[in-house]
């Protein structure tokens, strides 16, 4: 059953009033594939717009906090932790890992996915002048802890 639909099939924000407050955590990732020279410029700190990883990290954190403004049926959440980690993978990829936590009545998967996605979009925005062919890919949930549905971890 899709929880965001009422009995008539209309969009509906889920009522979490009666749900217990529990610790919840979610981890998501995204990757940005680019030209090797673009990644080298980022890693060497030679991008004319500044520290690409620092700006993308802040954008991801801010995005997690704004998820309910972007995705209509998401609840506004009081996040207790948002961490966004960026790293070079190989010669042409940036990997972004976003982790969100809270003690609340609903999960934080969308916040983690939004953080990873917006960090990736920020990298694209900052680097598009030198590499328009970048590809944002593999945006996915890696792990979820807490809540009624329990623990989920992506299969390797």
From Swiss-Prot:
InterPro entries named in the record: MoaC, MoaC_bact/euk, MoaC_sf, MoCo_biosynth_MoaA/MoaC, Mopterin_CF_biosynth-C_dom
Q: Which GO terms describe its molecular function?
A: cyclic pyranopterin monophosphate synthase activity
- Supply one GO BP term: Mo-molybdopterin cofactor biosynthetic process
Record key words, sorted: Lyase, Molybdenum cofactor biosynthesis
Keyword Transferase tagged: no
Q: Which CDD domains match?
A: MoaC_PE
Report the active site residues: 125
* Subunit annotation: Homohexamer; trimer of dimers.
Its name, as the record gives it, is: Cyclic pyranopterin monophosphate synthase
Per the UniProt entry, what species is this protein from, by scientific name? Pseudomonas putida (strain GB-1)
What gene name is given for the protein in this entry?
moaC
């Amino acid at each position: 059953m899709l929880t965001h639909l009422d009995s008539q099939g209309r969009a509906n924000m889920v009522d979490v009033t009666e749900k217990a407050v529990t610790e919840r955590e979610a981890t998501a990732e995204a990757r940005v594939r680019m030209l090797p020279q673009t990644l080298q410029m980022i890693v060497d700190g030679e991008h004319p717009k500044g520290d690409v990883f620092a700006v993308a990290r802040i954008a991801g954190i801010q995005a997690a906090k704004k998820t309910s403004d972007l995705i209509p049926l998401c609840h506004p959440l009081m996040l207790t932790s948002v961490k966004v980690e960026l790293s070079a993978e190989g010669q042409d990829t940036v990997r972004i890992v976003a982790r969100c936590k809270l003690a609340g009545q609903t999960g934080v998967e969308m916040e983690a996915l939004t953080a990873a996605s917006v960090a990736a979009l920020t990298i694209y925005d900052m680097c598009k002048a030198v590499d328009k062919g970048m590809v944002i890919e593999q945006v996915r949930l890696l792990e979820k802890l807490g809540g009624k549905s329990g623990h989920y971890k992506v299969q390797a």
